[in-house]
Amino acid sequence: MNRYTICIQLCQQCLVDCQNCLANMAGKQSMNECPVCCMECIDACLACIKSMSANSKFSKAYAAICAEICDWCAEQCGAHSHEHCQICTASCKACADECRKIAA
C-alpha cells in the first residue's frame, strides 16, 4: 500500500456517490448548486485519482483543489434531505479530509 491508497479509495467512493447524487437530481429543481457541484466533484476526484496513481509531482496540488471542491459539494448536498444527497455529503467530507492530509 502506497501513501496515496486510502485517498484514492475515498476519491473513488466520492466519485461514485457524486455520480449517484447527480443521476438522482437529474431533471429536478435544486435550491442551490447541488447538481453542478457533483459534476465538479466527479472531475476533481478523477483528476486526483489519476495524479496519485501516476505518483505525479502535482498530487499535492490536485489533492488540495479536490478537498476544496469536495467541501463545497458537501455543503451544497448537505442542505438537502434526500438520502442520496446525505450519502454524497458524507463521502465528500471523508474525501476532503483525506485529500487535506495529502496536500499538507
Language model features with spans:
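Amphipathic alpha-helical hairpins
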Residues: 1-104
